[in-house]
Amino acid sequence: MSKRDYYEVLGVAKTAGEAELKSAFRKLAMAYHPDRNPGDKEAEIKFKEVNEAYQTLSDDQKRAAYDRFGHAAFSQGGPGGPGFGADFGDFMSDIFDTFFGDARAGGAGPRGGGGRAGGRERGADLRYNLEISLEEAFTGKTETIRLPTSVTCEVCAGSGAKAGSKPRVCPTCGGYGRVRAAQGFFAIERTCPNCQGRGEIIDDPCAACGGAGRVTRERTLSVNVPAGVDDGLRIRLAGEGESGLRGGPAGDLYIFLSIKPHPFFQRDGADLFCRVPISMVTAALSGEITVPVIDGSHTTVRVPGGTQTNKQFRLKGKGMPVLRSRDVGDLYIQVFVETPQNLTKRQRELLQEFDQLGSQADNHPESAGFFSRVKEFFDGLSGSGRA
């Protein structure tokens, strides 16, 4: 029986890239996996066929040979045969993780670096919460922070072993850091119980770090907070996290910003909002009010006569700067008419006199319109009752 074309087996074009090959293989491998098709010989044959096709096309050298000579390029036994080689075992472990959860206790992390858990290991990322004022968010600032961090032990240079000694390869996992157990068609990897995933054994640990290869130190860092930052913004400082293990790269430090509530301004993006009280006289006759600005200055706003509560005034360019831009938001001032309290006898007399003078409809257009609509409503009810 002649072999099918590998591209046809996976259902991809000859120009398919690595991602497309991997996606097609995952789909077919899961569809024909013997655990999903118990006793189905045809599914088992197709499963092996899919594996063989992927083993060839996912390898650049094998793919080049196949594209040139076809199946004849592997007449001496084929690309790894129909069984499960080491690479396929790794890939099936990846599929198992994707569909059924992580079967590797402790999490082996991303593959690479020769596949040895005892090799270089990246340090953990750190988080620091920084609260600043709205004024500081307006101007930007440089903040000095202190944080405890795991850094490489200077005594053992991160090896974890006492000076004059060095770690030895773990005999249980051979330095791999994981042990593999075959279960049916799956090769499940677990953290090595002997070395706890390090891939090495330290017989004589460093006294300074206790064999960890790292010690905790308090570091001082300067954080540049740019103007225009908003609540919830995250600043990443690459390489300022915890030191890596066994020469691995350091993690990153993430600064999470929060803005303190302001007693006068509310913020919406780059725009600022505030509410300012005005007197009845200013609202009726006009006047000027002085309003603070976020930059620390003050500005004067002209209030025209007849201004009503919730009237809004816009001051262009008096808001917050837009992050990493030359644009600036606006300041919106909303006024509300404050009713006087604790009046003197004379003040009461003047207000009563003002009320007794009578009011024309155009003096209170909103009130006149409101009461006119109320009268029409009740007149309509009376008319319908008589009918």
Swiss-Prot record:
A zinc finger (CR-type) spans 140-218. Keywords: Chaperone, Cytoplasm, DNA replication, Metal-binding, Repeat, Stress response, Zinc, Zinc-finger. One of its GO terms (molecular function) is zinc ion binding. Zn(2+) 2 binds at residues 170, 173, 192, 195. Binds 2 Zn(2+) ions per monomer. Residues 5-70 form the J domain. Homodimer. NCBIfam families: DnaJ_bact, PRK10767.1. The J domain is necessary and sufficient to stimulate DnaK ATPase activity. Zinc center 1 plays an important role in the autonomous, DnaK-independent chaperone activity of DnaJ. Zinc center 2 is essential for interaction with DnaK and for DnaJ activity. This is Chaperone protein DnaJ. The gene is dnaJ.
